Amino acid sequence: MAYTLPQLPYAYDALEPNIDAQTMEIHHTKHHQTYINNVNAALEGTEYADLPVEELVSKLKSLPENLQGPVRNNGGGHANHSLFWTVMSPNGGGEPKGEVAKAIDKDIGGFEKFKEAFTKAALSRFGSGWAWLSVTPDKKVVVESTANQDSPLFEGNTPILGLDVWEHAYYLKYQNRRPDYIGAFYNVVNWDEVERRYHAAIA
């Protein structure tokens, strides 16, 4: 069964003024859709076409060599963006509560230390990529970054929060001001969804 573009859980303009409607619409309907089209084309007629995309990308290193490039770039793009849309909300922002807050305190040293590390991961990623809060196989939370459309799933970690720092994610509004975009992202983080994903990752 072919992958399809997930519906956003809010309107394109819902994250204004932090992320503008034009960027959201182009990012969702053009960039994300292209990753889906390309991974569907690569997988057509293979035994992997019916796998959930997260399972597909987690198996990257065991896939046939001719599929590894398309899955890395386009399967990764689909998985990453599918998470990205859900971890933002017009009612987002603030600080995490519950178990994920406790995990951040224990493993990273508190919310301010997390913000410092996450901002650094997003700022220092040269070129295109992502910043992540992920859960390791031993159930610790870590901040990491990946290049291009690489996913923490490639290395066995489970992403629970991600920030897209490709220029297409922010350039229309922020031009080259990536720090401003990163700062705005904290205003829309959907910590309830991050908490849900944390519980799923440690289950």
Curated annotation (Swiss-Prot):
Entry GO terms, CC: cytoplasm
Catalytic activity: 2 superoxide + 2 H(+) = H2O2 + O2
First-tier enzyme category under EC: oxidoreductase
InterPro entries assigned to the protein according to its UniProt record, in alphabetical order: Mn/Fe_SOD (IPR001189), Mn/Fe_SOD_BS (IPR019833), Mn/Fe_SOD_C (IPR019832), Mn/Fe_SOD_N (IPR019831), Mn/Fe_SOD_N_sf (IPR036324), SOD_C_sf (IPR036314)
Annotated Mn(2+) binding sites: 27, 81, 164, 168
An individual GO BP term: removal of superoxide radicals
Molecular function terms from GO: metal ion binding; superoxide dismutase activity
Cofactor-binding details, from the entry: Binds 1 Mn(2+) ion per subunit.
EC numbers on record: 1.15.1.1
Role of this protein: Destroys superoxide anion radicals which are normally produced within the cells and which are toxic to biological systems.
Entry similarity comment: Belongs to the iron/manganese superoxide dismutase family.
Protein's recorded name: Superoxide dismutase [Mn]
Organism: Xanthomonas campestris pv. campestris (strain ATCC 33913 / DSM 3586 / NCPPB 528 / LMG 568 / P 25)
Upper classification of the organism: Bacteria, Pseudomonadati, Pseudomonadota, Gammaproteobacteria, Lysobacterales
